[in-house]
Amino acid sequence: MSIVYISIGSNMGDRLEYLQQGLDAVTDMGDIGVISSVVETPSVGFEGSPFLNACFTIDTQLSPAVVMQKLLDIEQSQGRLRSQVQGYHNRTLDLDMIFYDDLVLDTPNLTLPHPAMAQRRFVLQPLCEIAPHKQHPDDQKTIKALLDACEDDTPLSIYELKLRHPIYAKLSAHTYICVEGIIGCGKTTLTKILAQNLGYKTIEERFAENPFLPKFYREPKRYAFPLELSFLADRFNQINENSEQLDLFQSGTVADFHMSKSLVFAQNTLNEDEYPLFQQLYSFMSKSANQPSLCIFLRQTAERSKTNIKKRGRSYEQNIPIDYLAKLAKGYDQHLPFLQKRMQVVSVDISALDFVLNTEDLIHLLKKINVQLDEA
């Protein structure tokens, strides 16, 4: 498997849509890896509209010649004919292979690395975003070093919109998604990532506004029942508020909780007299609450969650016992059949992943999700 680095650009029509269609078409060649931000630059060397440009990687088993031909075919499918116009000109879609692994190649039809890359800031800046330490095989200079030395002073700005990774396409079939897992597993972070890439709005649990939460961590037995009741009521209200607020610009929702998490926590915090009453209240309220069609369950170890809790630094969480997290993990495992009867559930072990800081781990997580969506 080889890693190919590709630059993509357009300055005609709906520029971002041309970029997106080009990116989506490349998936026939292999798996898309990381994608840079989109940058905007004025046209250079001719009179034309500003360009949008980006860079991305693809893992492929195809040869360089086949990759190049397929890129040309994709350009042609979007109305670009390279042979008709020489020099700088307007382009519906431009796809250039920058690197194919560390291959150095010089043939009449293909030169690798791309011979003009070091002179083009619109290539180097997005490339540096996704591969700053990648070395040019000729002189061993990193992309960061090439960018720092680049004399191209063409104005460049970050475009307000991003390209959607094709890996999110299957998730877009679900207009209401929830993310679940124990405290500190990364639910809210993944919720925000999914919402941003799908163009959905978020429902984020309002734990910071709950006056009982700090008190509960100090005196669990005393404040367990009012805490669970307040969370249940707030989750119910948030779901209903979301269903009442029609947003013409955002077609779906990602929530960092499912309402039934109240049952998981209540089982671990309430006594034998309180829990049956709480169950009755939940059953009554949940009947009128909208349900997601997909739940993404993040399976995390208690030890890793404890580490994450320490990192995010919420003072009232710092003394959460690790055995309490272990009980929650066991409670969620027992709760999964309850969710599976009501929606599609994708359960992913993330104990070896850091999708918050590592883009490759995020892509790995999304691939795991897609595998299970395909199997359903």
What are the language-model segments listed below?
Residues 17, 21-64:
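Short, surface-exposed acidic-centric catalytic microdomains
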Residues 36, 44-50, 68, 73-170:
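Flexible, gly/pro- and Lys/Arg-enriched active-site loops
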Residues 159-174, 307-376:
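NTP-dependent small-molecule kinase module
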Residues 187:
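Conserved lysine of the Walker
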Residues 190-191, 195:
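Post-Walker A alpha-helix
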Residues 196-234:
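Conserved substrate/cofactor phosphate-moiety recognition/catalytic segment
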Residues 226-290:
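Glycine-rich phosphate-binding loop used to anchor ATP phosphates in small-molecule kinases
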Residues 262-331:
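A glycine- and Lys/Arg-enriched "phosphate-lid" helix/loop adjacent to the NTP-binding pocket
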